[in-house]
Structures are given as C-alpha cells and as structure tokens.
A protein has these predicted regions:
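Structural motif marking the loop-to-transmembrane transition
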Residues: 4-5, 288
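Bacterial N-terminal signal peptides
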Residues: 5-15
Length: 318
C-alpha cells in the first residue's frame, strides 16, 4: 500500500512540475539497422545524409572524432564518407585524412559531393569517387568577408549557384558560382525579422531558398537574391529543411522547446500551413541532425546521438 501511494505522489509531482510532456505525434515505422556497416569499421557521430542521381545514399560520419571544443587540428584518420545502395549495402567509403570536424554533406546535380568542415573553416568539393577537386575558404582561419567562413554548416545548389549556410559563427547565407567565385551574401545575427541565429541547413527549390534558423526556432524562406519572403515558426528547433517535389517542404527538429532530443518531422504546405507531423525517433537516444528524402518517399535521418542512419517510408502526398 505504501508503494502505491509513493507512485501516486511521484506522478502527482510530475504533473505539477509545469514541464510539458513530449509532443504526441504518430510514430514512424523506423528501421534503425538499415546501414550495413562492415564489422570493424570505425563509426561515430552521423551528421549528414544525401542522395545522388543514381539513388546512392551518402552518409557523413565522424568515425573516432566527437564534437568537443576546442577542436583538434589533426584530420580524422578513418574514412568519413560512406556510400550505400538503396538496400543498405555498402558500395564505397572514402575521406580518410581529409576532414577535421565535418558537419554537412550535399550532393549536387553532377554528383559532386560538398562537405563543410567547421574546424577547417572550409567547404570542400569532391568528385563522386572522393577525389578532392576544390576548396573554399582559408584553412583554420575564421572570417566574415568574401574569402572566409565562420563554421560553415551546409550547402545547397541552384543551377550554377552554390548557397552556403555560414553558419555557427557568421549567421549568413553566402553564394558562390560552381568555380568558387563570390556572388553575394545576406543575413546577420539576431532574433528580429532580419536576424538569423545559426543557419544550420539550407535548400533551394523553385527560386526559393529555405534556411533553418535553428536557434530562433523557425524556417526562413528567401528569394535567390536574398529577399525575405516568409518566416515560419516551428515548435522545436529545426536542424534541417528539405523542399518536397509535390510542393511545400519538410523540416526536422532535433530538440523540442524543452531542449529534449528527438526527431520530429513536419510536412508543410507551400502556403506555410502545417500538414502532418511524425515522430521519427529510433529505439534509445535519438537526435536527428539531417535528413534526405528519396524519390519513392524513403526518408533517411542522420542520427548524431544514436550514431546511425534511421529510415522510414514517407508519403508526402498524404
């Protein structure tokens, strides 16, 4: 009897604590074992995922390196880029000795692989096979001019233009052509209409530039010239944003308003109205850092906390 009252007291105290419960949303049927990583592989924090024109899934992970400041200066000795077939079988891996603290990975229309490195303060462009082709920024040097970055986070593309979410230090979008020539930039740190607090993810579709204004808990939509078109508040902190082929866009929240980790996927209509919400957490701790959506609706989440790739079927047309 005493234990019964003790349980009731604990439940009552929890209810009166004022801490809201987690958002109730339908749970996605998540597969946490999709990636067939060979035994003995040094596998660590999974930070980014994207899909090439052949349907290969590129995964960026930090191997033995963890996000801890101050960052080391030595490159990661093991491969950090893994290319999987749609069924999860490993096709190739590369990138050993190239990056120090890799963050974002994006594949362009020519299947070039772009990686941001927040320690190197650079954006690296690789051929599909991992050959380094171009480097933007000065290694290890932060700055806010046309030739330097402030911990760049992500990359997106529109024709010959390359849009970079820059980033943890600069709170701006900076645009180059494909050969690395500076074109323009916009954004400044702040919480007001024109401010940005950590542009963590960027995507471009149909002349609209989608930016996850992470620490302001909102998605900002611009024209390609940098004109602010729309601002959409999100209940949690959006770590990634992706346009949908059917129109509208999807966002991924890795933290809710109470700073609890998770993976909430929201589907938004083109007019900014919320269409659907899914809880895409896997078993155990989950923190969705990035995601990608294949043509058939298969979705891939880079789970930086669970050190894995989560997959589930998403039908944006529902």
């Amino acid at each position: 009897m005493r234990s019964h009252w003790l349980v009731l007291a604990i439940l009552f105290a929890s209810a009166c604590s004022g801490v809201p419960q987690r958002e109730e949303a339908p749970r996605a049927a998540v597969d946490a074992d999709w990636a067939q990583v060979p035994e003995g592989t040094v596998w660590g924090e999974v930070t980014a995922v994207d899909i090439d024109s052949h349907g290969h899934v590129f995964v960026l992970q930090r191997a033995s390196r963890v996000w801890q400041e101050p960052f080391p200066a030595e490159p990661i000795a093991e491969p950090v880029v893994f290319m999987f077939a749609r069924d999860g079988k490993l096709v190739a891996s590369w990138g050993a000795g190239e990056t120090v603290m890799p963050h974002g990975l994006s594949v362009d229309a020519e299947d070039k692989v772009w990686i941001t490195d927040v320690q190197r303060e650079q954006v690296l462009r690789f051929a599909h096979d991992g050959t380094l082709e171009m480097t933007l920024g000065e290694r290890g040097v932060s700055g806010s001019d046309q030739k330097h970055f402030g911990r760049p986070a992500d990359v997106a593309f529109a024709g010959e233009q390359v849009f970079i979410a820059d980033g943890y230090g600069n709170s701006r979008v900076i645009v180059f052509d494909r050969e690395g020539h500076y074109l323009r930039q916009w954004g400044r740190e702040g919480a007001g209409k024109d401010g940005v607090a950590l542009p963590h993810s960027i995507a471009v579709e149909g002349g609209r530039v989608y930016v996850s204004d992470r620490e302001n808990a909102r998605i900002k939509i611009y024209s390609e010239a940098g004109e602010l078109l729309e601002t959409i508040a999100t209940p949690g902190y959006p770590y990634a944003v992706k346009p949908l082929e059917q129109g509208g866009f999807a966002s991924l929240e890795a933290r809710d308003a109470q700073d609890r980790n998770g993976a909430i996927v929201r589907l938004w209509r083109s007019d900014g109205r919320l269409e659907r919400v899914l809880d895409a957490r896997g078993p155990g701790e989950t923190k969705g850092h990035d995601f990608a959506i294949a043509e058939d609706g298969t979705s891939y989440i880079a789970d930086v906390e669970g050190l894995r790739v989560l997959t589930f079927a998403l039908d944006p047309s529902r």
